[in-house]
């Protein structure tokens, strides 16, 4: 993502001003949409049968992530109809995500809020379960610092 843009261009980009060229905004918006699609597993194929296993990884992987007061984590498996229980990647906690330039990160957060709050229900986003979407918003609101107010409001 963001491969042809310079760090300076992205850092200085402000969607509400002329500092960011319209071409750069268009390119970034495409990349931001791709990141959001990835993060909500929009292209995930449904499981046709229950996945079972007894590996150590299957038991320890969910324990690596933060949990909210209800004991929920983005790393919790479903393994019946989909891989994870909640439609949001645990990569939201990654250093890579946190290192995104602020204008880009703000836009990714905004897209995720639109998708997970149910505001965006077109195409591939229509298949997402509203209860699981709300839970994902709540889990992140309880376990990640420095979230935008729109995220916190959508999680309530």
Region locations from a protein language model:
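Single conserved hydrophobic/aromatic residue that forms the stacking wall/gate
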Residues: 1-19
